[in-house]
Amino acid sequence: MSTVYTRPLARLIEQLQRLPGVGPKTAQRLALHLLKRPDSEVQALAQALLEAKQQVGLCSVCFHLSAEPVCEVCRAPSRDEGTLCVVADSRDVIALEKTREYHGKYHVLGGLISPMEGIGPEQLHIQPLIQRVSQTAVEEVIMAISPSIEGETTTLYIAQLLKPLTKLKGAKVTRIAFGLPMGGDLEYADEVTLARALEGRRELD
């Protein structure tokens, strides 16, 4: 990095650039802003980061982010046990919860099948999904995966795995009706679009 920065500042900017969506200019702006803040604020930020990293893990049931062994959604008796919404990661759970239209349970895959990145089905939480569907009273599995190439691959792969199981149980696999362009991310859709996508879901053949 340019010698215009002192070494500690250069290191801070480099680390900030590792964050998603943060380029060199944004990293510089954030770093300079932090240096102007009182020590107490910077220490509070650092402490919050450490606590989140140390205390937040994955729910043992659905693999959503949780500070407890089982997350609030999985523990809630008011949630519909008959519907299970499959998403790529926790950002999608947050986006769907904001719609206030979905009242079932979730299953977080932890990513998407992507041979180019070396991510196969075995790296995702697909087998636990199959076990949940086979062992619980799930009547509908909703595939809420972004319509990218990786998303389509993952959706169709899981649908094929679930097909004999859901047929045996009299259940169904559906997918949400995206109002997104190909490659659009679920987390960036507004609440109205997501709510309509849930309402307009259709069964996968």
From Swiss-Prot:
Q: Which SUPFAM superfamilies match?
A: Recombination protein RecR
Q: Which Gene3D superfamilies match?
A: 3.40.1360.10, 6.10.250.240, RecR Domain 1
Q: What functional role does this protein have? A: May play a role in DNA repair. It seems to be involved in an RecBC-independent recombinational process of DNA repair. It may act with RecF and RecO.
ZnF (C4-type) spans are 59-74
Among SMART domains, the record links this protein to:
HhH1 (SM00278), TOPRIM (SM00493)
State if DNA repair is listed as a keyword: yes
Q: Which GO terms describe its molecular function?
A: DNA binding; zinc ion binding
InterPro entries on file = DNA_Rcmb_RecR, Hlx-hairpin-Hlx_DNA-bd_motif, Rcmb_RecR, Rcmb_RecR_Znf, TOPRIM_dom, TOPRIM_RecR
State the similarity comment.
Belongs to the RecR family.
Matches recorded under Pfam families: RecR_C, RecR_HhH, RecR_ZnF, Toprim_4
The record places domain Toprim at 82-181
Among the record's GO biological process terms, what is one? DNA recombination
Sorted keywords for this record are: DNA damage, DNA recombination, DNA repair, Metal-binding, Zinc, Zinc-finger
PANTHER family, A to Z: RECOMBINATION PROTEIN RECR (PTHR30446:SF0)
What CDD domains does the record point to? TOPRIM_recR
Q: Under what name is this protein listed?
A: Recombination protein RecR
